[in-house]
Amino acid sequence: MTPSAASALVEKTPLETYVPPAKPSLIGLSRAQLCDRLGDVGVAPPQRKMRAQQLWHWMYVRGARDFSEMTNVSKEMRATLAEHFTVDRPEVVAEQISADGTRKWLLRLPSGGDGQKAHEVECVYIPETDRGTLCVSSQVGCTLNCAFCHTGTQRLVRNLTAGEIVGQVMVARDRLGDWIDRETPNGNRLITNIVMMGMGEPLYNFDAVRDALLIVSDNEGIGISRRRITLSTSGVVPNIKRTGDEIGVMLAISLHAVRDELRDELVPLNRKYPLKELLQACRDYPGASNARRITFEYVMLKGVNDSLDDARKLVQLLKGIPAKINLIPFNPWPGSNYECSDWDQIEKFSEYVFNAGYSSPVRTPRGRDILAACGQLKSETEKLSVRERNALRAMAMTD
């Protein structure tokens, strides 16, 4: 298989760096950083920790959107905070609701300083009978060029800040009424799980992703357990161990091939970090056990990686790793060179892997009709034409 021009590059370079606005948001700051910002506006050292805890509670427990809501903070302090800061999160530009209940939000990030353009990202809420999962983005665009992924065709504009990542969770909670003492207008369904599987490669934005997930998992705030947060990477090997040590969330690997020559084409990052290095990093992942298995994501591509020989090789590769295998039917998008494997072939592949002792669920495609399924996200900064959108919807309806 000859690599396409689009996938020839292993990584893309960001077109921009983030420039903070003149009045920055406090969303995404650690407690220590909040104390520093309070010091910047004249709060005395003995009061900073207490004030920071008040802000933390209002932002992450009650979802305050304005300092005026913070009724146990003095009027003078609220005025000072409002003069210098905001608690803004991204703006909802559009909301789409799939026939299966999946929701996709197009979010406009606050524009930065020096006239920096406001950019857009997407996040997706997936309701299920026993959980509600939010798929969160880490970059505007993506560093990588995975051949089967729509997001990978987009430019990498810039990394998101910790505040912009946390802000996606807060927007979803706003829309779902998922804050304490709030009405729940959308069926009383709560966000119980977070997956870092939206736009971008999280481990190429490690510091911001780490800081955001530590806030999201803080039990005095949003409080989503680290065991209910999954970070998916295409294999940035040097940061895999750091993920376990510094964040402690569940790990997922976008594997998709069992031979280096094929993975070089599907996931060009493999040329930098080949399978042997990637799988060793998984064996060494801190905290991995039968109770905390690593998920290996495997998109099923017709005639490419879906043979029983591929299944046998997959089982061999994962020997010694506490693992489960998530088989993903390929989600079509206009211009893609791939097709989804036939369902009977997916079932045979799954059965072989299951009989070898690995959990191998087939992911149910969700939100295809609104371009919200795995591999379909692409922000409005890289708009689809009407023809492309109609073509994609037609493909979704024929599955």
From Swiss-Prot:
Q: Which GO terms describe its cellular component?
A: cytoplasm
The record's annotation in Gene3D superfamilies points to:
1.10.150.530, Aldolase class I (3.20.20.70)
In terms of CDD domains, this protein maps to:
Radical_SAM
Q: How is the cofactor bound?
A: Binds 1 [4Fe-4S] cluster. The cluster is coordinated with 3 cysteines and an exchangeable S-adenosyl-L-methionine.
Tell me the domain of life: Bacteria
Query: Chief subcellular site?
Result: cytoplasm
Keywords, alphabetical: 4Fe-4S, Cytoplasm, Disulfide bond, Iron, Iron-sulfur, Metal-binding, Methyltransferase, rRNA processing, S-adenosyl-L-methionine, Transferase, tRNA processing
**Per the database record, which ranges form the Radical SAM core domain?**
128-371
Q: What does UniProt list as catalytic?
A: E122 (proton acceptor), C374 (s-methylcysteine intermediate)
Database matches in Pfam families: Radical_SAM (PF04055), RlmN_N (PF21016)
- The residues that the entry says bind S-adenosyl-L-methionine are G200, E201, S232, S254, L255, H256, N331
Name which cysteines form disulfide bonds: C135-C374
List cofactor names only. [4Fe-4S] cluster
* Keyword Nucleus attached: no
- Enzyme type, top EC level: transferase
Q: What does the record give as EC number?
A: 2.1.1.192
**Catalysis performed (reactions):** adenosine(2503) in 23S rRNA + 2 reduced [2Fe-2S]-[ferredoxin] + 2 S-adenosyl-L-methionine = 2-methyladenosine(2503) in 23S rRNA + 5'-deoxyadenosine + L-methionine + 2 oxidized [2Fe-2S]-[ferredoxin] + S-adenosyl-L-homocysteine; adenosine(37) in tRNA + 2 reduced [2Fe-2S]-[ferredoxin] + 2 S-adenosyl-L-methionine = 2-methyladenosine(37) in tRNA + 5'-deoxyadenosine + L-methionine + 2 oxidized [2Fe-2S]-[ferredoxin] + S-adenosyl-L-homocysteine
Q: Where in the cell is it found?
A: Cytoplasm
Which residues does [4Fe-4S] cluster bind?
A: C142, C146, C149
The similarity comment for this entry is: Belongs to the radical SAM superfamily. RlmN family.
In the UniProt entry for this protein, what further remark is given in the free-text comments? Reaction proceeds by a ping-pong mechanism involving intermediate methylation of a conserved cysteine residue.
Name under which the protein is recorded: Dual-specificity RNA methyltransferase RlmN
